[in-house]
């Protein structure tokens, strides 16, 4: 149980949308080295353009809902934005497997988790999640038009 209510006046700093939202999400990826995080490079730190571009995705740092993402990136795509390389990342492509049975074709799933880490506590606490189903090349509304059994919701979990 938290020591405060959301409606109480408290001394906190909120992470605001959009700039801090974008900075915290994609901006941190090149700094995280883990088998659970796809390899990610700031474009302006790229030593050479990879030969296997079919395994990479080009993403603008400050975009939302997949806008500006080049899923099938080409050398000209990279060369075009290279002058603005400080606001782009190149990320290893993640292949989502269609494992959720639906009435027509299996869907891919993504589960995003949000944790809060209360000061003085040893671990963060899971507070909410976002579950999304997709049948498109990417997860998001623009990539799932005219598809059924796709979209987002909150998932229930045991405490």
Please provide the spans of the model-predicted regions.
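Domain-scale recognition of functional cores that engage charged ligands
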Residues: 1-159
